[in-house]
């Protein structure tokens, strides 16, 4: 593993240039007025004057989509809240990346594209103010059970793309209308000691079991060299997700790409669907490590989503030193939600190989929940050094012997 992954030192914001406290530039304290233009003007001013740190001081400041520029950074002071507008008109439609596709969709609350060294810091909060979006989603789903996530028209909390040397540290990232953190085509990205939360129930009175839909904690989309260390994650979907593209020709599309060299460590999970999920919108995931984490009540620790319409290859995944409680430790099923298989004669066979589980002490209701398909094969799975043969479930795992776990 590269030495870069050992660096968990926080960024000292005093080294990032002048601090621009937004209230010094006409931004008013108060949660009701949407002040997108005023806050964006502070960002633009900082960029024009050589860069610096845009500071959200104590208090609540409501805004729509903000776009950070080269040399600028965001700091949320303790007691400060950057709160998202709950009106979709405050988030412009632009060419972006969502659900494994490059397409026109709504901007996120905090956007950073093409930046080197961008930092989000502070003990304060970025609050997506998602309640109205969540309730609209579930009402729409009642009206049309086939509606997609994009049909509901919701912004993400943060979207970082085509960037490098990025650090998000210490902040509270809560109540996102859609995905909480989405990073795309970026490298050397660190999430350090972040608190990531979205409610998992009691947000929709007709059905109290409903939570914030598709509020993934961190979506890693076609990125390399990502470190997630010391974070707390409790969301109504998957926690850390490897993405990279979907569709029958996804491996031929240059807007897609692999996820490689991702380390998740020392994290704590509340309720999530999966601690580490590969897919469903993923093409190639390689050298992914989940280690030394605690899960309170996750549904699945490792979830490998296999799309029948997408050529996928998941390899060299290590899950080590996980403690706590879960329903299912390893979960592998075909994923058929909203899939569309094209007519491709040379469609590659999808594969999972070299999946290692080592020294885990998890109270699991089910250790393995594995289904197979003629669309993919599973090879070289090991548990504590012992090869696993899932022939008791199906015939798709090779190179193993049956053991009773």
Q: What is the meaning of each model-derived region?
A:
Residues 1-405:
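Extracellular/periplasmic carbohydrate-active domains that bind, remodel
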């Amino acid at each position: 593993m590269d030495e870069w992954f050992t660096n968990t030192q926080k960024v000292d914001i005093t080294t990032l240039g002048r601090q621009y406290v937004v209230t010094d530039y006409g931004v008013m304290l108060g949660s009701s007025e949407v002040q997108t233009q005023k806050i964006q003007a502070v960002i633009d001013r900082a960029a024009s004057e050589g860069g610096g740190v845009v500071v959200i001081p104590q208090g609540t400041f409501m805004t729509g989509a903000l776009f950070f520029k080269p040399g600028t950074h965001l700091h949320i002071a303790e007691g400060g809240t950057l709160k998202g507008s709950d009106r979709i008109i405050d988030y412009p439609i632009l060419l972006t990346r969502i659900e494994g596709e490059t397409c026109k969709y709504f901007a996120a609350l905090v956007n950073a594209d093409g930046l080197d060294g961008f930092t989000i810091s502070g003990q304060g909060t970025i609050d997506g103010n998602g309640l109205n979006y969540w309730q609209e989603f579930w009402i729409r789903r009642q009206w049309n059970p086939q509606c997609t996530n994009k049909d509901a028209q919701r912004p993400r909390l943060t979207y970082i793309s085509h960037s490098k040397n990025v650090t998000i540290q210490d902040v509270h990232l809560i109540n996102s209308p859609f995905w909480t953190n989405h990073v795309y085509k970026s490298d050397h990205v660190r999430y350090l000691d972040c608190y990531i939360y979205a409610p998992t129930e009691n947000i929709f009175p007709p059905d109290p079991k409903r939570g914030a839909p598709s509020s993934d904690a961190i979506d890693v989309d076609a990125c390399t060299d990502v470190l997630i260390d010391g974070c707390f994650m409790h969301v109504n979907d998957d926690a850390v997700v490897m993405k990279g593209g979907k569709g029958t020709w996804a491996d031929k599309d240059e807007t897609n790409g692999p996820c490689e060299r991702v380390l998740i460590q020392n994290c704590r999970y509340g309720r999530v669907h999966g601690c580490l999920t590969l897919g469903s919108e993923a093409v190639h995931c390689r050298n992914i490590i989940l280690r030394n984490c605690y899960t309170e009540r996750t549904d699945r620790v490792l979830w490998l989503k296999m799309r029948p319409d997408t050529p996928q290859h998941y390899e060299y995944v290590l899950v080590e030193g996980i403690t706590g409680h879960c329903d299912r430790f390893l979960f592998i099923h075909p994923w058929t939600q909203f899939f569309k298989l094209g007519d491709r004669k040379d469609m590659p066979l999808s594969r999972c190989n070299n999946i290692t589980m080592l020294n885990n002490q998890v109270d699991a209701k089910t250790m393995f929940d594995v289904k197979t398909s003629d669309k993919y094969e599973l090879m070289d799975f090991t548990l504590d050094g012992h090869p696993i043969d899932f022939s008791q479930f199906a015939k798709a795992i090779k190179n193993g012997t049956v053991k009773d776990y």
